């Protein structure tokens, strides 16, 4: 929950290997808002991961409220209390910025926050 590795897919071979692993592994994957990343995975591989959970959908189910401001499920909104403000400008999301330390920190923090949220929800549901 506090350490992450960020893999930079800076060539087609690595990109292909990682995407193939994502859609073929039997290991359960935890995503927050697979709708976003899943679009890219599906576009490149014409399928989605075999076994995954989406922490955003689960959070929305648990927090559901007619007033959407009372059921916000964005990762930064839900985990900001623990990880602070880690968002970066959308200008950073380009191939030119893939080695930018701020973007790498953002990616690592997103991963840690997703796992932490998943663990918190799982523990809540066990009680």
Positions of predicted regions on the chain:
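Active-site-proximal helix-loop-helix substrate-binding element of RNase H-like nuclease domains
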Residues: 2-127
């Amino acid at each position: 929950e506090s350490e992450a590795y960020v893999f930079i897919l800076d060539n087609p071979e690595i990109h292909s290997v990682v995407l193939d692993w994502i859609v073929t592994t039997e290991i359960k994957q935890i995503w927050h808002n697979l709708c976003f990343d899943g679009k890219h995975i599906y576009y490149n591989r014409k399928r989605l991961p075999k076994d995954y959970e989406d922490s955003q959908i689960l959070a929305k189910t648990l927090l559901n409220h007619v007033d959407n401001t009372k059921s916000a499920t964005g990762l930064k909104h839900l985990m900001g209390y623990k990880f602070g403000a880690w968002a970066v400008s959308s200008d950073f999301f380009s191939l030119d910025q893939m080695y930018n330390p701020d973007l790498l920190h953002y990616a690592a923090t997103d991963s840690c926050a997703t796992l932490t949220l998943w663990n918190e929800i799982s523990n809540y549901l066990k009680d």
